[in-house]
């Protein structure tokens, strides 16, 4: 099983080929290929490579499928014994990326 742990926009993701992941918004066009080069760990069928902090020999190639928005999160604040209430919603901008290849040199 080939997988990699990649850092994207400050978060770490366990990535496998052929699957898609919802990441924070990446400002690029649809159907464009991207290269993820901040690879922290790679597993090539039992051979584990660990970066310090990143692996220069491993590149992850993906394709942007769509831009979407996440589920709505409700933020509700109130002060007890007062008439102060504040209800606010938030939807995160996301980008769906299909991982096509994990290339290990």
Curated annotation (Swiss-Prot):
Subcellular location as annotated: Plastid, Chloroplast
UniProt cross-references to InterPro entries, sorted A to Z: bL21-like (IPR028909), bL21-like_sf (IPR036164), Ribosomal_bL21 (IPR001787), Ribosomal_bL21_CS (IPR018258)
First and last residue of the signal peptide: none
UniProt keyword terms in alphabetical order: Chloroplast, Plastid, Ribonucleoprotein, Ribosomal protein, RNA-binding, rRNA-binding
Manganese recorded as keyword: no
Cellular component annotations (GO), alphabetically ordered: chloroplast; mitochondrial large ribosomal subunit
Main location (coarse class): plastid
GO terms for MF: rRNA binding; structural constituent of ribosome
A Pfam family assignment: Ribosomal_L21p
Biological-process GO terms, alphabetical: translation
UniProt record similarity statement: Belongs to the bacterial ribosomal protein bL21 family.
Biological role: This protein binds to 23S rRNA.
Assembly information from the UniProt record: Part of the 50S ribosomal subunit.
Protein name: Large ribosomal subunit protein bL21c
Gene: rpl21
């Amino acid at each position: 099983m080939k997988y990699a742990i990649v850092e994207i926009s400050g978060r770490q993701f366990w990535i496998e080929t052929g699957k898609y992941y919802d990441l924070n918004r990446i400002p690029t066009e649809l159907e464009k290929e991207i290269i993820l080069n901040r690879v922290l760990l790679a597993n090539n069928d039992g051979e584990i490579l660990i970066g310090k902090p990143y692996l220069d020999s491993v590149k992850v190639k993906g394709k942007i499928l769509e831009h979407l928005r996440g589920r709505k999160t409700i933020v509700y604040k109130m002060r007890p014994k007062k008439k102060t209430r504040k209800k606010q919603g938030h939807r995160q901008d996301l980008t769906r990326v299909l991982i096509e290849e994990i290339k290990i040199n």
